[in-house]
């Protein structure tokens, strides 16, 4: 028998054994959750095939299998979480038990074998690495005046572009991407770029290539042995990562050569400083050494996730403002009353603009940027609710389902910022335990504070000056997203009309 046939037969027998092993009590007591039908080798893939909007497919399957159910991705046992009660148990109550990450071909390529924060295995080294990242962000980053100035600088540049193109149908996506990219580049590398800069264009190209290929859920992540065959998507991913790594290495080398410890210019300097401090303060325990690769992949995490996610949330916000002009008008009225036109918005204005804050929160709820959170892995035999979960199970939290639970949200598909306001009109940060836009617990998003700063300042600056409208000759753009690494917005154009009040202020 040919070697490949032997391998396939062995895999089929292994899957059949695992499937039979997994059966038993599946709906009550201490048994596992009910599972989708599964076949040897392929598992439950046939149940998911033909459904590109995976988050919606998993959301609807709970009508048949309950809010917590299992399925098989090839030989991998996966538990799907659709309720906030189970989500909070996984993320908070039993965060350490579910702190693992799956090792896949794609994530190993993205993180150089798990040397980053997002995909690394949970353990002493990961905890030490995350602690240093928090220290670096505190040293240069989250909430700092310097970072606010950077965001305001890019917001002003964005407004200049909109002003030059006012009354024209404009695709805002490239401009939003440039603005957010410059914020993250300034944070990480102390550099920013003008439109058309070759290095900037290379960043955009490799970032989009990574997003496009990872979004396709390559079969090699389910069946790693498929790597022996030609794979166009995997080849493209490797080419994009080669460009990414060359750019990161160039920046890192420049920083190491210039680093003196007296001046911290950016996050990369801060990471070098906190690593040096940790090494000088006490001898590191064996296995806790952070290599240059760890620092590079950490910066790569912040850059990659920080650009794509925040840009996507901004695009969704603009899209919903086109669909709900009354919301946009109310934000502008609030800004006119509380801030006026004589000065620019600042982060300190957030308590003065509760309706803008509520609008941002509602956008994060109704279109979660990551409808399926990065999968967790159970590090020991454990449970979720009344159900047993074996060690090594992959746990997928369907944030779309959590944010559209009719038991928690009245008319969840309706865009209503008012659900994030109290009776006095003040912003409620979390009106329901079913609100988890950045995850929670041990694996909570590192960029939450930065993202909230950017969302507030970019929207405040733009709406103080412009009214965003759909071009008259075009229909309102679709609110249907495209599932992928992020919930992507379909392309649309917008007309940024200079507000009469702001025009008058400019004349004065």
UniProtKB/Swiss-Prot annotation:
It holds the Pfam family p450. Pathway: Lipid metabolism; steroid biosynthesis. Gene3D superfamilies: Cytochrome P450. Keywords: Heme, Iron, Lipid metabolism, Lyase, Membrane, Metal-binding, Monooxygenase, Oxidoreductase, Steroidogenesis. Heme binds at residue 445. Its cofactor is heme. It comes from the Eukaryota. GO terms for cellular component: membrane. It is found in: Membrane. Its EC number is 1.14.14.19, 1.14.14.32. It catalyses: a C21-steroid + reduced [NADPH--hemoprotein reductase] + O2 = a 17alpha-hydroxy-C21-steroid + oxidized [NADPH--hemoprotein reductase] + H2O + H(+); 17alpha-hydroxyprogesterone + reduced [NADPH--hemoprotein reductase] + O2 = androst-4-ene-3,17-dione + acetate + oxidized [NADPH--hemoprotein reductase] + H2O + 2 H(+); 17alpha-hydroxypregnenolone + reduced [NADPH--hemoprotein reductase] + O2 = 3beta-hydroxyandrost-5-en-17-one + acetate + oxidized [NADPH--hemoprotein reductase] + H2O + 2 H(+). GO terms for biological process: hormone biosynthetic process; progesterone metabolic process; steroid biosynthetic process; steroid metabolic process. GO terms for molecular function: heme binding; iron ion binding; lyase activity; steroid 17-alpha-monooxygenase activity. Belongs to the cytochrome P450 family. Conversion of pregnenolone and progesterone to their 17-alpha-hydroxylated products and subsequently to dehydroepiandrosterone (DHEA) and androstenedione. Catalyzes both the 17-alpha-hydroxylation and the 17,20-lyase reaction. This is Steroid 17-alpha-hydroxylase/17,20 lyase.
């Amino acid at each position: 028998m040919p070697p490949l046939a032997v391998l396939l037969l062995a895999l089929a027998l292994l899957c059949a054994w695992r499937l039979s092993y997994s059966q038993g009590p599946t709906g009550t007591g201490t048994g596992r959750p009910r599972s989708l039908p599964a076949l040897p080798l392929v598992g439950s893939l046939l149940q998911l095939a033909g459904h590109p909007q995976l988050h919606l497919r998993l959301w609807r399957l709970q009508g048949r299998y309950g809010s917590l159910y299992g399925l098989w991705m090839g030989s991998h046992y996966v538990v799907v979480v659709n309720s906030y009660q189970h989500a909070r148990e996984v993320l908070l109550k039993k965060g350490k038990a579910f702190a693992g990450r799956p090792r896949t071909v794609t994530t190993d390529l993205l993180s150089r074998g798990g040397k980053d924060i997002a995909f690394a295995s949970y353990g002493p080294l990961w905890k030490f690495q995350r602690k240093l990242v928090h220290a670096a962000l505190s040293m240069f980053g989250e909430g700092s005046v310097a970072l606010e100035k950077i965001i305001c600088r890019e917001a002003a540049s964005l407004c200049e572009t909109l002003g030059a193109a006012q009354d024209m149908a404009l695709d805002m996506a490239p401009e939003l991407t440039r603005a957010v990219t410059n914020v993250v580049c300034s944070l990480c590398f102390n550099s920013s770029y003008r439109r058309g800069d070759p290095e900037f264009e290379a960043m955009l190209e490799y970032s989009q290539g990574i997003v496009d290929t990872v979004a396709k859920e390559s079969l090699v992540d389910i069946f790693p042995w498929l790597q022996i065959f030609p794979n166009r998507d995997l080849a493209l991913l490797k080419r994009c990562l080669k460009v990414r790594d060359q750019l990161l290495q160039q920046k890192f080398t420049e920083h190491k050569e210039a680093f003196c410890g007296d001046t911290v210019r950016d996050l990369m300097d801060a990471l070098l400083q906190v690593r040096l401090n940790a090494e000088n303060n006490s001898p590191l325990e064996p296995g806790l050494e952070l290599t240059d690769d760890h620092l590079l992949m950490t910066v790569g995490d912040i850059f990659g996730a920080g650009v794509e996610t925040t840009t996507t949330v901004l695009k969704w916000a603009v899209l919903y403002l086109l669909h709900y002009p009354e919301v946009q008008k109310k934000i502008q009225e609030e800004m006119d009353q509380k801030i006026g036109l004589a000065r620019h918005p600042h982060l300190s204005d957030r308590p003065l603009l509760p309706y803008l804050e509520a609008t941002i929160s509602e956008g994060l709820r109704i279109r979660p940027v990551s409808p399926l959170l990065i999968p967790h892995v159970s590090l020991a035999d454990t449970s979720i609710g009344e159900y047993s979960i074996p060690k090594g199970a992959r746990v997928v939290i369907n944030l779309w389902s959590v944010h559209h639970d009719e038991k928690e949200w009245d008319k969840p598909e309706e865009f209503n910022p008012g659900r994030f306001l109290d009776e006095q009109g003040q912003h409620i940060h979390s009106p329901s335990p079913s609100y988890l836009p950045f995850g929670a617990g041990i694996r909570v998003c590192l960029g939450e504070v930065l993202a909230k700063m950017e969302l507030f300042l970019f929207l405040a600056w733009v709406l103080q000056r412009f009214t965003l409208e759909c071009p008259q000759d075009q229909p309102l753009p679709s609110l249907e997203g495209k599932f992928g690494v992020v919930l992507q917005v379909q392309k649309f154009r917008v007309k940024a009309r200079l507000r009469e009040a702001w025009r008058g202020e400019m004349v004065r």
